[in-house]
Amino acid sequence: MNQSLLAPFGTAIERVEAGLNALRQGQGVLVVDDEDRENEGDLIFAAETLTNAQMAMLIRECSGIVCLCLPDEKVKALELPAMVEHNSSQYGTAFTVSIEATVGVTTGVSAADRVTTIKAAIADNAKPSDLARPGHVYPLRAQPGGVLTRRGHTEGTIDLVQLAGLKPAGVLCEVTNPDGTMARLPEIIAFGALHNMPVLTIEDIVVYRKSLLAKVG
């Protein structure tokens, strides 16, 4: 990762703390993974604070494949099976079947409908029958252990919202350029500056979590 580009955002610890503060305030954060992995940046919001305007941004400025990151126990509680029996994707991205709220939506595609679906899924009393399958929101199952187990955006999202003291559910979408290509670090930093969003990396979250473990130890 080109640390010189990230230097204006502070140290790894400072970048994560800025991200946590943004999430607590209901704002978005940009998270970049390792250059030797997907080398992509995702725009992430806490699911519980997600607004229709923020969903519209995810649809308009990003790839449009809006994903809901959930911990393993929530996926099991909602009885969401894996999208495929044998996952052969390069990085083992753990998609479940797609979902739609059974109440309060029309076609399920609009920003408002997708937010309604997400709020239905993350409700404390949510039941499998609250969600139709398939739909227009794509849940992702996070590995237990977070980024210390798997260095993916799914795990990074759950780690961040939990570290921020929020409900363990987050929404992400890959940032794209206007021409449809994937945004890399320079474009992601420019996007963050334009929208006043902090930028951090999966590696930063690893460093932050290890520092917390060291303090406990």
Swiss-Prot record:
Cofactor stoichiometry and binding remark: Binds 2 divalent metal cations per subunit. Magnesium or manganese.
Cofactor(s) named in the record: Mg(2+); Mn(2+)
Keywords: Lyase, Magnesium, Manganese, Metal-binding, Riboflavin biosynthesis
Task of the protein: Catalyzes the conversion of D-ribulose 5-phosphate to formate and 3,4-dihydroxy-2-butanone 4-phosphate.
Protein name: 3,4-dihydroxy-2-butanone 4-phosphate synthase
Positions of Mg(2+) 2 binding: 38, 153
Pathway: Cofactor biosynthesis; riboflavin biosynthesis; 2-hydroxy-3-oxobutyl phosphate from D-ribulose 5-phosphate: step 1/1
Keyword Cytoplasm: no
Keyword Transferase: no
Gene Ontology BP, a term: riboflavin biosynthetic process
Positions annotated to bind Mg(2+) 1: 38
Entry's Gene Ontology molecular function annotations: 3,4-dihydroxy-2-butanone-4-phosphate synthase activity; magnesium ion binding; manganese ion binding
